[in-house]
Amino acid sequence: MSTKTITVVPGDHVGTEICDEAIKVLKAIEKVSPVKFEFKHHLIGGAAIDATGVPLPDETLEAAKSSDAVLLGAVGGPKWGTGAVRPEQGLLKIRKELNLYANLRPCNFVSDSLLELSPLKSEIVKGTNFTVVRELVGGIYFGERQEQEESSDGQSAWDTEKYSVEEVTRITRMAAFMALQHNPPLPIWSLDKANVLALSRLWRKTVDHVMSTEFPQLKVQHQLIDSAAMILVKSPSQLNGVIITSNMFGDIISDEASVIPGSLGLLPSASLASLPDTNSAFGLYEPCHGSAPDLPANKVNPVATILSVAMMLRLSLDCLKEAEALEKAVGQVLDAGIRTADLRGSSSTKEVGDAVAAAVEKILAEGK
């Protein structure tokens, strides 16, 4: 019997509720699986600022480093504003300190019964299935910058974006690895702005070199980021496969993609520090949605967090059977109409969590 250690950092507002449901599901899996989970709870974001004065306490970071994976709820809220110390700084710092260089965001439909919820026509989005692989610890978000008040005349501000061949190489290898998990391998789309930006030209050249020398069996196509943004609205399935792009472009394009399934409450994400080639890469898992400070208690959709746990089971905890069962359980629950208000349902957060926990326990028990 193996024990997997998970550092839980709920963060702010709905973060605690969604993490509670994720833990509920993992405890249900424990009942019918040889794997056991140990949970270590720590602070991040606004909750950490209130308690310690900093958005990422040292003890949180050390706990994360000594665990098999990290489960994050959500950070931020108007209470903490945009001052010098902000909740989001904790998220950026933990990504950097843990070297979580690859962010994976799937965009698909857990169930075809959700197609009608998309803001796009069902016939346009049906069959959409891609994963955005976003470089997460480089680029403009981590480049040198100058605030307006720091300039000599108080009339300018700037940020810099920089990528090295090494940084582009490792994110390309991650995209290739994800593509090779399928038979036949998935196509790869590399998004850049090579017609304007020098770093995009380095990006494109490096991607081509890595793909041609290390993964000649894979198909890679380059697409300008603005063109890809249009395709995503007009015909999203055209980008099916694996999308690889830089930090800022990935942030924007994955947020655009997040509205396709109809609710941010459906979309999981993983941030990895290495290739999951042994299904045991260290990673941080979180829903794509924010902290929803205006949402009443017990109303948030926990599905994105629960599906993030499924990714954790597959990529970090080497629990492939449990991951598949959990994804199947989520589909069954949604098909049964047990949904929160964002999916035109009337169920509460806890009711959805209870239903998924019961479903995954039953699926695993029947599979013994």
UniProtKB/Swiss-Prot annotation:
Entry annotated with the keyword NAD: yes
Listed GO MF terms: 3-isopropylmalate dehydrogenase activity; magnesium ion binding; NAD binding
GO BP: any one term: L-leucine biosynthetic process
InterPro entries recorded: IsoCit/isopropylmalate_DH_CS, IsoPropMal-DH-like_dom, Isopropylmalate_DH
Database matches in Pfam families: Iso_dh
Top-level taxon of origin: Eukaryota
SUPFAM superfamilies per record: Isocitrate/Isopropylmalate dehydrogenase-like (SSF53659)
Residues reported in the UniProt entry to bind substrate: R95, R105, R134, D226
Sites where the protein binds Mg(2+): D226, D251, D255
Cofactor or coenzyme needed: Mg(2+); Mn(2+)
Keywords assigned: Amino-acid biosynthesis, Branched-chain amino acid biosynthesis, Cytoplasm, Leucine biosynthesis, Magnesium, Manganese, Metal-binding, NAD, Oxidoreductase
Gene Ontology CC annotation, any one: cytosol
Enzymatic reactions: (2R,3S)-3-isopropylmalate + NAD(+) = 4-methyl-2-oxopentanoate + CO2 + NADH
EC number: 1.1.1.85
Record localization: Cytoplasm
Annotated site residue numbers, Important for catalysis: Y141, K193
Primary localisation category: cytoplasm
Cofactor binding note from Swiss-Prot or TrEMBL: Binds 1 Mg(2+) or Mn(2+) ion per subunit.
Residues holding NAD(+): 77-88, 290-301
Pathway it works in: Amino-acid biosynthesis; L-leucine biosynthesis; L-leucine from 3-methyl-2-oxobutanoate: step 3/4
General function of this protein: Catalyzes the oxidation of 3-carboxy-2-hydroxy-4-methylpentanoate (3-isopropylmalate) to 3-carboxy-4-methyl-2-oxopentanoate. The product decarboxylates to 4-methyl-2 oxopentanoate.
Subunit structure: Homodimer.
Similarity section: Belongs to the isocitrate and isopropylmalate dehydrogenases family.
Protein name, UniProt field: 3-isopropylmalate dehydrogenase
Gene responsible for this protein: LEU2
